[in-house]
């Protein structure tokens, strides 16, 4: 039987938010015990700003809703530029303002295997979606979407790396994650 919390299980496997040459294989092996769970992978360019913000916001929303044992939530990058780096300090501070911790995060790159393992691959902008499709060899199962599309919006999540506006990114991520959680829990 799978442990109650997939996050704790990934920590026990020694791979939660760690980047090694074997981390993607280890994540895949650990996720096999969670076949009945909703698996979400948030994706951005570097996995240090928007996608980890979405990962930790969604984990917090899921925890608040008492559904921790129904979801596996992670994040990844489309690029290799920031591999192994922690959450960008201003993002860490923005999360902390809202009582959300992101300790131990290390950026990792999305792989084709993630397409098989996760039911939902959520990009932050159109370029992310394009790169996700390239990495995965397309999106034949329709698993890839933009975060804000779940909130009925056609725009991209503001990228604070360029804008410096971490509050705007927080607002976008919060709106998108709340809408996504509502959508997914209504399906169950």
Cite the ranges covered by each PLM segment.
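Phosphate-binding/catalytic loops
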Residues: 120, 126-188
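Short, Lys/Arg-enriched N-terminal segments with co-localized hydrophobic residues
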Residues: 16-36
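Conserved active-site segments centered on acidic
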Residues: 31-117, 182-188
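Cationic, low-complexity basic patches in intrinsically disordered or flexible, solvent-exposed regions
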Residues: 12
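Extreme N-terminal basic, low-complexity initiation segments
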Residues: 2-9
């Amino acid at each position: 039987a799978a442990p109650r919390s997939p996050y704790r299980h990934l920590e026990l496997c020694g791979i939660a938010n760690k980047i090694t040459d074997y981390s993607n294989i280890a994540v895949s092996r650990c996720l096999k015990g969670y076949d009945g769970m909703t698996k979400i992978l948030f994706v951005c360019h570097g996995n240090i700003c928007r996608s980890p913000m979405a990962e930790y916001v969604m984990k917090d929303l899921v925890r608040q809703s008492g559904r921790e044992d129904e979801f596996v939530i992670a994040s990844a990058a489309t690029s290799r530029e920031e591999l192994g780096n922690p959450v960008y300090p201003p993002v860490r501070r923005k999360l902390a303002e809202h009582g959300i911790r992101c300790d131990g995060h290390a950026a990792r790159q999305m792989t084709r295997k993630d397409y098989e393992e996760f039911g939902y691959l959520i990009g932050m902008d159109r370029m992310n979606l394009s790169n996700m499709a390239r990495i995965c060899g397309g999106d034949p199962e329709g698993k890839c979407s933009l975060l804000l599309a779940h909130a009925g919006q056609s725009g991209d999540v503001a990228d604070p790396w360029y804008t410096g506006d971490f509050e705007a990114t927080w607002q976008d991520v919060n709106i998108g994650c709340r809408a996504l959680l509502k959508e997914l829990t209504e399906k169950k």
